Amino acid sequence: MSLHLVDADGHLHSEKRLKEYLTTIVAPSVSQSGSAATADDGDGDSTLEAIGVNYHVVGVFGGQSSGKSTLLNHLFGTDFQTLNEAVRRGQTTKGAFMARANDALAGVEASSAAVVADRLASGAADRSSCLNRAAAAAATKDVADGAHGASRTASLMLVLDFEGTDGLERGEDQCFERQLSLFGLSIADTLIINMWAVDVGRFNAANLNLLRTIFEVNLQLFSHDKYEAEEKPTLLIVLRDFTEDDPAPSLATVRKSFDTIWEGITRPAQFAGASIDALFHLKYYVMPHYKLQKTEFMTSVETLQRWFSDSQCPDYLFSHRAMFRGVPLEGLPAYLTSCWEAIRTSKDLDIPTQREMLAQHRCKEAKMQELKAFRHFARNYEDRLLHGEMLLRLSEVLDEEMETRLTSFYRQTKLYNSDVVGQYANELETELVNATMRVLNRLSKAIAAEVLSNAEPRVLNSVEESLRQLLKSAQTLPFSAGEGPGAAEAAEVNDVEGDAAHLVGAQRMDSPACQKLVRSFWRSLSRHVNEVVAEVAAMPPRAHLYGRYVALIAQDPTTRLNVLNIVTDALFQKVKSRMVSMADSACDTMHAGFERSLTHNSDGTARFFATTKGLQKAVPAATQAGVVVLGSLFYFRLKLVAAADDDGIGADAAGTALPQSRSARRVRQDRHRILFNDNDAEAAFYLSYSTFDTAPKYPYDVPVRSADCDGEEAGAAADCILLSQQATVRAYELYRQKCDFTTQLQLRTIEAGKQRLPAWVIPALFILGWNELLYVLTSPALLVLVVVICAVFFKQFFVSQWHAFEETGPASVVIPTKTVIHTLSTLVRPLLDYGPGPRTERTERSHDAAAAVEEMSHVEATCTHVDPTLGSANLPAAPATMRHRTSRKLD
């Protein structure tokens, strides 16, 4: 059964019809139910895919009525229409016909897949891709299948019968002749040139004009850069009705005619000195007269059949690499359609490009098919997750299915252009991994929500702890030399209210030391957050973090790493959100730090002031602490950077290697770390401090890069700047106003609560009561009684006087006195432990515990920057806080 491939008007059958025909001639049993079914269902496609490149195409060219169809019918057992000389002589074949060679003819032997594989071994690297394990698995399976089916796999042969040239019907129009020649050269392994022996040596009678056209067309194909020299087709020149004894003279004449035609063709520079053998494999064969030597003719037909079918024959025609351009049989309809369309539209036919287009088309189909199958598979697990089902080892199941899909893709496309296959394989792998990650992310986000609910309070407390450490360090940071003491002594001779502001403004801050404290704050915050992240990544997983997902995480390393990525990113954003909220209310944050530093000692204990001078001494240090807080708020210095593959995070205690699946590699690529690491520009992007009279200097001279700029560009990141220069100045001014207001209220409260006797009372008591004083001093019993009464009833008075002396006295006297008291207390305390001392000690310890609880409650109450997810807290008014502390002290 033959197919009219190209009709007389130059119309090629549709791609669908070509596929139906090929399916019919390859596996007739598949198409018994109807030709439409074979084109639509998968049986026909799988049948064509099974052939692969194990087939050949043979075409014939020659003059009109020269016996081309007759030769093909005898040689390949086809049923092409032949000339009926009793009716007329004229054109019989119009356009081009296709048929399958009859394998049952004598001399046609089966060619096993193993033989084909041996012939294609030299080009195997160009047809298959070994990009990954899937390709290797596909190749292994195909080799095994070939070994089992070698004995029953026959080499398919397709025969093309082209319209004869020099016919009366076409006249002098050679356009269609040239199109058919180009079409034949683009698809056939071997072209048979049918010539009459009596026409050898003639130009027109031998139809050598056809040879000239074929030479020019093939030269056009070879002019492309990507065309491979090994793919040159075979020209089999058959001399018909040869009656001489020695064919050598005739063959020499044919070769000379070919060389003459070749020399007369205008050739490109790369073929200027080349012979015709650079473009063709030339083979010659002579056949006896068809009518006069019928028996000899049939014998020569059988001999020529072995040239096409017997791989052991010395003249076997398919031993070179051409092998039909490397186009698999299932891609033949698309390839024929593409080539003929390019020829008919007078486009420059580039066979390598056509092969690439065919490979792209086939690879795209295979990719979409495998991707659709995988998405359907993954959707089932996604639905199970939506119903709350807990799936163990989900990543392993998805990775195995992904491997199956890739193996199937390579098996379908292994015979196409390796570069195109590799490109689409990478695209398929990327989309498969994306689909896998969508399912894993759904599971991982549910687990990450559980982890975040348990880990988030610790991270937020880390911010508060780092801020407390910053305030503690800033509170004890000394001012620049020569400023503090002189200013403090000068305050004694001035008015109390006016002197407080002067004292604070006179202090000069140590700017490098303050910047160092800011760096320490961010370094400490980074360390605290990474401790939480390390605990999330620890193996075995912690039950207090993962809750009910502990068993799942322990069995699925890929999901655990993915959860770690989500948690790390979420904690980073949570810390940044917290710092942004603190920067938005920078004045309140600074004032809260000022109050804490003013009302607490560096060791965290509560502090009360008995004199205004003591308060004035503490105000500069407290003010400095708040200003340092401002330096920590105006720029966010933590970074989320890619983590190194060998950092060890995610490995268990036994040192088990991390998973190496495709989804695991994607998860590792998305891993990040939180760290504090200033670049050169950020190292200079700090506030510069001088005195309290002026706001800190903003680093406006440091370049700032926008968020869309390259990360390698030097400069501070614009999206990390939390406070602009104007916002920094405004926050500082409001902070100073609040500090001054709080200080003045505290000073007035201290002044109002003083219970001071007139200066003349003490001398008067000594003068008027001198006799009584001597009597008491000389009477031991009475002296002891007076001391006990004073210790019991005037203890608070003496303590307040000592605090006043401690705050106002010179340091040269206060420090030695405190040292002596501490030494005596150390010596006497062991002696008192045997008496009622333990009760007193327990009482003091209970007072200390109560003070610690009160301190913690005060810290929580003064924080106004609680994250929205944790609720809201209001800062108590400063005056009320100070009055409460003062009144409690005085009572």
From Swiss-Prot:
Q: Which residues form the signal peptide?
A: none
GO CC: one term?
cytoplasm
Stored Gene3D superfamilies? P-loop containing nucleotide triphosphate hydrolases (3.40.50.300)
The UniProt GO MF terms for this protein read: GTP binding; GTPase activity
Task: Give the EC number.
Answer: 3.6.5.-
Q: Which Pfam families match?
A: RHD3_GTPase, Sey1_3HB
Write down the top EC class of this protein.
hydrolase
Cytoplasmic side, ranges: 1-756, 802-891
Record-linked CDD domains:
GBP
Transmembrane ranges, per UniProt, are 757-777, 781-801
Under the heading PROSITE patterns, the entry gives: G_GB1_RHD3
Annotated localization: Endoplasmic reticulum membrane
Binding-site residues, GTP: G62, G63, Q64, S65, S66, G67, K68, S69
What's the protein name? Protein SEY1 homolog
Give the species this sequence originates from: Leishmania major
